[in-house]
Amino acid sequence: MVFGKFTERAQIVLVEAQKESQYFKHGYIGTEHILLGILKECGFANRVLYISGITVDKVRNLIEDYLGFGDVDVSIGEMLLNPRTKRVFDDSLAKAMMYNHNYINPEHILLALLDDVESIAYTIISNLKVDLKGIKTEIINYINKNDINDAKQLE
């Protein structure tokens, strides 16, 4: 898996996604939980989403509408990624490599989510009627300008 390439900020996204999965008792970490993880990490991807009108409450409400609550209790140490989430993380690494980065930050993850048109996260973002192209442009501009600072966060 690509976790060794995650910056501290990307690790926060994953931890927060796991907490959201536990909140919904889904028993897995899906792209919808990753989206919530990005919204709970205090970085640039978070700010772009919030400025676009995507909030934790809106996303949680849509997850509840689409998937409801499950009945699976998973301990904090277990990380059960569904296949689509694994693919998003692999795609995040590919995005990072496109920019000659040897690390993954939340912005790479968000770009991968925005390209996965069959994911629940993409469906949620689309249903919130935001400017997907504008979000992508903001993220790409940020990545191009901030690669050195994020590389220092790699642990």
Pin down the residues of each PLM region.
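Histone-fold recognition with a strong bias for associated Lys/Arg-rich disordered tails
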Residues: M1-E155
